[in-house]
Every structure is written in structure tokens, then in C-alpha cells.
Amino acid sequence: MAKKNKPTECPAGEKWAVPYADFLSLLLALFIALYAISAVNKSKVEALKTEFIKIFNYAPKPEAMQPVVVIPPDSGKEEEQMASESSKPASQNTETKATIARKGEGSVLEQIDQGSVLKLPSSLLFENATSDAINQDMMLYIERIAKIIQKLPKRVHINVRGFTDNTPLNKTRFKSHYELAANRAYRVMKVLIQYGVDPNQLSFSSYGSTNPIAPNDSLENRMKNNRVEIFFSTDANDLSKIHSILDEEFNPHKQQE
């Protein structure tokens, strides 16, 4: 009677199971990442963070909430470029205050303890969602803002702040949201200088996609976050005067009286 052959034992035993399990974990993480970035929204990003914490026992660092740059204006670069942006037909000078105000519909003036903030949607100011070129139709409105600033006390400091949403900057010349926001704030500041605002009163900041005022989960909210803010700050003695002047100038009901 023939002897039964004993089953061949693997000399490595079950050592293959450990790297195989690691491989499956990495593969799972990859598919989770691909799924999340296919349609980015806040809930999916949070789910992705949770899965990475579970798989790798790693907690992602929170985004910085401080501006990347606060830069006072330089001497005279891009003067010719900004001059071409500010050029407009003479017929536009006959437009009434009400017409100019309509160009700024969508802007919001808020009074705060430190001063006032004028919020301007980027969709109003710039040619498209990833551009830093100011819309020519908005030049008269920015000129009006400059004239209002010139009525304020010289002690008032104006900081032009750029913000974006979190939409990926694919196929653009900007390497980051900070760069896009900085360029936009700088452009608005240069136009204000072009229209007579004292450069010593001005600076600009870039916050990139940080400090959103609404969740980036819809087109409407992303449009709110994609903005330029003009922040007026001064000491307590001038606050009431600033509030009064800005409220009178930017309140459409008072303009019609």
C-alpha cells in the first residue's frame, strides 16, 4: 500500500500576512482619497481626515488662521499697468452717484469695534473666478471709494485684505490661494493710490482660503468667501466720525434723499 505524501509546508510560514495586510490598508487609504477628491466638500474632507487618523494614527495639522503677508505699498511699480486699468471713456464721468452705487450692489459695509469693514465680492471686482484683473465696470466704484477715503481723518489706516474660496487653482498662473488673494488685494490698493489715496494710509494682506465666512459647500457660499475686504481702523476718538461718514456714503437710502 502506497504511503500518503505529507503536505508541503511553506518555509516562510505566515509571515506574508503582515506586509499583505499593510498593502491592503494603503490601498484602502488610496481609494478613500480618490473618492474624496473626486467631489470635494466639507463632509468628505472630514471623513478623509477621520479615516487617515484611524489607519495611520495621524492627526492632520489645522490650517493657519493668520495672514501670510502684510505689506506696505512700494514706490512706483506697475504704474503704467494700473493707469491703463483706470483709463475709461469720458462719457462715464457723467454717471450719477446712483448709477455708480448700482455697480457696487453686493458690497456690504459692517461696523465693528475697531472700525469698519467694506466687503466686496470678487465676482463683482474681477473678470473671472481665478483672475486678478479688475473689471473695468468697477473702476468708477473704486474711484468713489477712494474719494470717500480722502474725506476720512489722516489717522485712519486702510488695510486691503484678499480672501479666496477653496476651489483648486487648476490651469492658472497662481501657485496658491495666498498668491491669488495677495495679487487681488494689491491690485485694489494700487487703484486706490491711482485715485489719490495717500499711500502712507494703505497696506494689504492675503488670507488665501483661510477665514471663510461660510462653509465652502455650495456655489453661493464660495462666492461669499471669494472676496476683498477694505478694513478701516483708527483710535477710539475717530470711530464715531468714520462710522458716520461711511454709513452716509454707502447707505443707498441716504444717497437718494
Curated annotation (Swiss-Prot):
GO cellular component terms attached to this protein's record: plasma membrane
Membrane topology term: Single-pass type II membrane protein
Listed Polar residues bias regions: 83-97
Side Cytoplasmic, residues: 1-16
Domain (OmpA-like) ranges: 113-236
Topological domains annotated Periplasmic: 38-257
Superkingdom of origin organism: Bacteria
UniProt record, GO biological process: archaeal or bacterial-type flagellum-dependent cell motility; chemotaxis
Keywords associated with the record: Cell inner membrane, Cell membrane, Chemotaxis, Flagellar rotation, Membrane, Transmembrane, Transmembrane helix
PROSITE patterns documented for this protein: OMPA_2 (PS51123)
Function: MotA and MotB comprise the stator element of the flagellar motor complex. Required for the rotation of the flagellar motor. Might be a linker that fastens the torque-generating machinery to the cell wall.
Family: Belongs to the MotB family.
NCBIfam families: PRK08457.1 (NF006285)
Subunit details: Each stator complex is composed of 4 MotA and 2 MotB subunits. 2 A subunits and 1 B subunit are thought to form a single ion channel, so that each stator complex contains two channels.
Protein name: Motility protein B
